[in-house]
Structure formats: structure tokens, C-alpha cells
């Protein structure tokens, strides 16, 4: 898994969005919760949301997310320098407008592949899935792999009422964590193909 972090002066390193080392689980209740989470993703056609991202070093950023399942996601970071993350079924494109450059990575090497797949499987082959119940009706589903493609930990955090995704967290193999908390979520609104278009920079 790859992580996007803000340095000073502001600069986003590649590709992340997202947290938490979990311990303990309840196998029976956990299986039910995982199925409920998979059903939640299956029922999402489109989503728009604001987000706040916090990195391990305490740096923060805000922006907007547009998702059209399956496969399509755009994450736009506010502030300077501008940064956009845009997915296709195969690629994660990192658009840096200030440098007039797009860099592309296989989506399978990022945690985004797990939540953009059709269907979503939160117990994929080769991964360990652990469920943890937290205070206030919060449920965390951690999907972990020690090595190889997609190594690291993705944690999805759901509220109980309504049951929906509120935060995701990524921890890479070096232990660097990034969390993204969603706000002002809206579902089922039109999302056109143009929202996921890539710029045509010279010499690309």
C-alpha cells in the first residue's frame, strides 16, 4: 500500500488515503458485520463527500471525494499545491497540476482496489480480516497483509445508526498511518464521466 502525506513546504507524496492496528475479534459477530459492510458497498452507486485527512506526522488536509462504483473515484485535495487522485478499473492516476504531470500506478497495488471492486470482498484471499467493536457503536474492519502486492493494513470504520462508512485508515508496511474521515456524505446523485477525465499535459 502507498501513502499520500503532506510535507512542509506542502507536498503530497504518493497515493494514500487512510489506519489503526486492531487486536481481538468475535468470529461470529465479525462475519455478520463483514457481510453487512459488503452489502453497504454493493448498494452504493454514487457518493459525494467532504473529507479531512490526518497523517502520522500530524499534518492535515481537506478536500472532496466523488465515487461512482464500481472502479471510479476522484479525490481532490484543497490548497496548494493542487493534487487529484483519479481511478480507472486498472490504474490510479496521480495528477499534479502545478507540475503539469500525471503519474500512474496499478490500482491493485493500492487499498482503493478493495472498496472499488465489484463485488466488494472484505475477506479477500491472502489477507487477514479482523473485526473490532469500539465505543459509541463504531465498528472497525481491518484487512491486513504482511508482504507482497497490496501489503499493509486497510481499516474501514462504520457507524451503527445509520450503518455507513465514516472513516478509512491505511497503514503501510513501515507503520506509517493516514486516516480519512468523511463528512457531508450524499448518495445517489448524478456523476458524469467528465468528472474522472485526465488532463492532457504536453509531453505526457
Predicted regions and their residues:
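Short hydrophobic/aromatic-rich beta-strand segments that constitute the beta-sheet cores
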Residues: 51, 73-77, 92-95, 143, ...
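A short, Trp-centered hydrophobic/proline-enriched beta-strand micro-motif
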Residues: 39-58
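Sec-dependent signal peptide recognition
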Residues: 11-18
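N-terminal signal peptide c-region/cleavage motif recognized by signal peptidases
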Residues: 24-26
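An acidic-aromatic
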Residues: 62-114, 178-179
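Gly/Pro-enriched, hydrophobic low-complexity segments
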Residues: 123-204
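N-terminal secretory signal peptides that target proteins for export/translocation
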Residues: 1-9
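Boundary at the C-terminal end of the N-terminal hydrophobic targeting segment
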Residues: 28-31
Amino acid at each position: 500500500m502507498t501513502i499520500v502525506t503532506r510535507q512542509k513546504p506542502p507536498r503530497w507524496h504518493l497515493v494514500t488515503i487512510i489506519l489503526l492496528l486492531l487486536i481481538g475479534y468475535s468470529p461470529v459477530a465479525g462475519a455478520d458485520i463483514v457481510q453487512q459492510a459488503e452489502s453497504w458497498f454493493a448498494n452504493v452507486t454514487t457518493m459525494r463527500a467532504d473529507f479531512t485527512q490526518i497523517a502520522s506526522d500530524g499534518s492535515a488536509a481537506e478536500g472532496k471525494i466523488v465515487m461512482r462504483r464500481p472502479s471510479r473515484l476522484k479525490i481532490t485535495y484543497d490548497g496548494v499545491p493542487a493534487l487529484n487522485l483519479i481511478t480507472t478499473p486498472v490504474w490510479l492516476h496521480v495528477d499534479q497540476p502545478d507540475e503539469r504531470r500525471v503519474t500512474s500506478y496499478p490500482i491493485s497495488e493500492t487499498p482503493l482496489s478493495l472498496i472499488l471492486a465489484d463485488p466488494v470482498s472484505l475477506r479477500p484471499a491472502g489477507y487477514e480480516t479482523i473485526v473490532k467493536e469500539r465505543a459509541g457503536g463504531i465498528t472497525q474492519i481491518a484487512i491486513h497483509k504482511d508482504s507482497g502486492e497490496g501489503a499493509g493494513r486497510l481499516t474501514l470504520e462504520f457507524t451503527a445508526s445509520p450503518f455507513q462508512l465514516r472513516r478509512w485508515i491505511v497503514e503501510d508496511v513501515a507503520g506509517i498511518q493516514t486516516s480519512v474521515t468523511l463528512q457531508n456524505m450524499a448518495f445517489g446523485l448524478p456523476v458524469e464521466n467528465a468528472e474522472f477525465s485526465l488532463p492532457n499535459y504536453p509531453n505526457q
